Amino acid sequence: MNILVLNGINLNMFGKRDPKQYGTITLAQIDEQLDALGAELGATVQHFQSNHEGEMAERIHQAHVDNVDAVLINAGAWTHYSYGIRDALAILKCPIVEVHMSNIHAREPFRHHSVIAEIARGQIAGFGVDSYLMGLRAAVNLVNAAKAG
């Protein structure tokens, strides 16, 4: 089972930006935890981060070509306005799980709306790194349920 984890704009700065919202964990540390959990769950986890919207869209297109089993995405600020990322994700035939370290619904009003939510199977927000770990578990469960038919 292949799970693709996508991290959007500014998320490479985890550990350096706003520790009140995001804690001090780095993206590399999050990736390590996801790899370890993926191994426990029988999933191979691939990681991609970009601060460039076109690069992110191209990686999502490649995920379609590669026929990945599920996508876990934290699009960062793109969550709230990038119809380009949303439309690229809509091409995928696999489950999409949206995750956020902070509770986007308890922050600034512009963060309350996600353009990705309507095409995602679910959204997990506000639990720090555990949002990613719960998201990975959810993605694996969705893939396993689909295979069990």
UniProtKB/Swiss-Prot annotation:
MF terms (GO), sorted A to Z: 3-dehydroquinate dehydratase activity
Residues at the site labelled Transition state stabilizer: R17
BP GO annotations: amino acid biosynthetic process; aromatic amino acid family biosynthetic process; chorismate biosynthetic process; quinate catabolic process
PANTHER family: CATABOLIC 3-DEHYDROQUINASE
Family the UniProt entry places it in: Belongs to the type-II 3-dehydroquinase family.
Functional note: Catalyzes a trans-dehydration via an enolate intermediate.
Protein name, per record: 3-dehydroquinate dehydratase
Source species: Leptothrix cholodnii (strain ATCC 51168 / LMG 8142 / SP-6) (Leptothrix discophora (strain SP-6))
Phylogenetic classification of the source organism: Bacteria, Pseudomonadati, Pseudomonadota, Betaproteobacteria, Burkholderiales
Gene name of the encoded protein: aroQ
